[in-house]
Amino acid sequence: MAESKVVVPESVLKKIKRQEEWALAKKDEAVAAKKKSVEARKLIFKRAEQYAKEYAEKDNELIRLKREAKLKGGFYVDPEAKLLFIIRIRGINAIDPKTKKILQLLRLRQIFNGVFLKVNKATVNMLRRVEPYVTYGYPNLKSVKELIYKRGYGKLNHQRIALTDNSIVDQALGKHGIICVEDLIHEIMTVGPHFKEANNFLWPFQLKAPLGGLKKKRNHYVEGGDAGNRENFINELVRRMN
């Protein structure tokens, strides 16, 4: 007796074919994703090396200029700062509506919130208005790095996301050529062409109360208090609050 031939319905054959095609596509996708990941890691490493070299060259140039000025019997004057870090040091008691509005515009809604700010006429005018409620100064590379690595959160799809992975930065800022945390640090530190986008991506930093406390929050820094411009000494305060 001849064996009966099993006829597989066409719909089943089509389904099997679709599954095979899907599996092949997923495999190709995985290979492409792995290749892209390897290339991205190489690029990130290369950029990190490039930035380290750039920062070192800048430091060496600064040392050279200071030595040169000293040899000539003068002193070196730092170029005008482009970047500020502002920390809110007072609450809402007895605060007038205009000052409150400016603090909100600066994204300093809570005490010990901190934000980066580009120096220009508009920001300087705003800072003058809210000076009794904030302290600020010129952050160095160490401060910018430590703030972003230790307390950095980004805004992605209206969510506050910890910067635990370069892919978070890439998703939000990749279209601006900022694909990793080191790119983000460089854009902030150098006040680059996409500083606004990079800074808006960063959630305001929530710092802790400073070790040793604050002296006199109502008095200006130059009067022995805490408010206002403390120039390079902001970095010492960042260490105490980070």
Swiss-Prot record:
One GO BP annotation of this record: maturation of LSU-rRNA from tricistronic rRNA transcript (SSU-rRNA, 5.8S rRNA, LSU-rRNA)
A Pfam family recorded for this sequence: Ribosomal_L30
Domain of life assignment: Eukaryota
GO molecular function: RNA binding; structural constituent of ribosome
Gene3D superfamilies for the chain: Ribosomal protein L30, ferredoxin-like fold domain
Alphabetized InterPro entries for the sequence: Ribo_uL30_ferredoxin-like_sf, Ribosomal_uL30, Ribosomal_uL30_CS, Ribosomal_uL30_euk, Ribosomal_uL30_euk_arc, Ribosomal_uL30_ferredoxin-like, Ribosomal_uL30_N_euk
Record's GO cellular component terms: ribonucleoprotein complex; ribosome
The entry's keywords: Ribonucleoprotein, Ribosomal protein
The family this protein is said to belong to: Belongs to the universal ribosomal protein uL30 family.
PANTHER family: 60S RIBOSOMAL PROTEIN L7, LARGE RIBOSOMAL SUBUNIT PROTEIN UL30W-RELATED
Record protein name field: Large ribosomal subunit protein uL30x
Native organism: Arabidopsis thaliana (Mouse-ear cress)
Organism phylogeny: Eukaryota, Viridiplantae, Streptophyta, Embryophyta, Tracheophyta
